């Protein structure tokens, strides 16, 4: 089958993941789909990744280290497939994943997203899927949700298949090193989003994730996330298809940005951080999540805004570090015995 007849390209991007990349590649080859091609891009790894990749026999390229976004663009240039899945080298597809995904790859679809099971560095399951399947059922108008909150329910990078024109937006995202920004955020404005509630892949959580999942809470990282989000929203507003229903996104009124401002204020010990609560609570109450979730989110943000700074920081860690999401960890955070 020639490159022009493939319906989907899976681009595996790798940097120093010698211990995982063979499993990632093997999980794609095991799908046994003639209408899918596999392309591996090694982003100048300094470990044994390239040797491992070559042994698999797949079509692979080794380039000078330039970051995930550049590696994925390089891979995109090697295929003409109309849909692309960027698979991180530490993640995997589960058996039958592409059989479930490919029938949905239609011209009007901008993105197909699916759930990922969370595993640790050793492959042990960590509990519930991401996102939770129930959240996929509460979609509503995703464009309006992005305008109001700055986000929508979406899996990490490896849980998405993008139409090619969305991937082309990466070329102008020189403010970003990753690929899970503009193309995820812009997808609802470019076509339909198909959400599959099945667990079709594995997402590895460890301290080397590009997303930062599994790391501690750090003020500089929060600031970086806020600046990245600001750049991403500006990019979205530039490329958003213009019609009467698609107004620009105002970053300063979105849930994502307001929440990060409050979290940053709590982490650095900013006096008067509670003054940020009204705007944030207004966005939470207007969201489409069920009342119980609104109550939990509202309670969390009220607590981190009024508790002593040390307790507030502990509570933030409980929420944002998966390994700390236990009843005991929450009790320790609230009583100041988290350390």
Model features per residue range: what roles?
Residues 16-30:
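Short, well-formed alpha-helical segments that are part of the catalytic scaffolds
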Residues 27, 42-51, 88:
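A conserved acidic beta->alpha catalytic loop
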Residues 84:
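Short aromatic/hydrophobic "clamp" motif used to bind/position activated sugar donors
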Residues 148-150, 156, 177, 204-339:
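C-terminal subregions of glycosyltransferases and related glycan-biosynthesis enzymes
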């Amino acid at each position: 089958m020639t490159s022009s007849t493939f319906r989907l390209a899976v681009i595996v991007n790798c940097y120093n993941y010698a211990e995982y990349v063979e499993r990632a590649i093997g999980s794609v080859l095991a799908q046994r789909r003639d209408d899918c091609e596999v392309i591996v891009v090694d982003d100048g790894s300094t470990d044994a990744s390239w040797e491992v990749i070559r042994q698999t026999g797949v079509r692979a390229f080794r380039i000078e280290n330039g970051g995930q976004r550049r590696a994925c663009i390089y891979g995109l240039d090697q295929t003409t497939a109309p849909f692309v899945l960027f698979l991180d080298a530490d993640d995997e597809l589960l058996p039958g994943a592409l059989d479930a995904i490919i029938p949905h790859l239609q011209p009007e679809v901008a993105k197909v997203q699916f759930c990922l099971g969370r595993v640790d560095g050793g492959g042990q399951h960590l509990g519930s899927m991401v996102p939770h399947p129930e959240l996929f059922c509460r979609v509503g108008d995703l464009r309006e949700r992005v305008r109001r909150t700055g986000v929508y329910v979406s899996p990490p990078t490896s849980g998405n298949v993008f139409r090619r024109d969305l991937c082309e937006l990466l070329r102008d995202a020189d403010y970003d090193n990753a690929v899970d920004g503009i193309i995820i955020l812009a997808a609802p404005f470019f076509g339909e989003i198909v959400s599959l509630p099945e667990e079709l892949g594995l997402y590895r959580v460890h301290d080397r994730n590009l997303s930062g999942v599994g790391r501690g809470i750090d003020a500089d990282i929060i600031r970086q996330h806020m600046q990245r989000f600001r750049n991403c929203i500006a990019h979205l507003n530039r490329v958003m298809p213009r019609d009467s229903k698609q107004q620009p996104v105002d970053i300063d009124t979105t849930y994502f940005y307001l929440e990060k401002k409050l979290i940053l204020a709590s982490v650095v010990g900013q006096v008067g951080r509670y003054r940020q609560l009204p705007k944030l609570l207004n966005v939470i109450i207007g969201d489409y999540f069920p009342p119980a979730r609104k109550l939990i989110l509202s309670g969390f943000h009220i607590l981190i805004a009024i508790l002593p700074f040390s307790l507030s920081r502990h509570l933030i860690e409980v929420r944002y570090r998966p390994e700390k999401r236990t009843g005991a960890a929450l009790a320790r955070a609230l009583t100041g015995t988290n350390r």
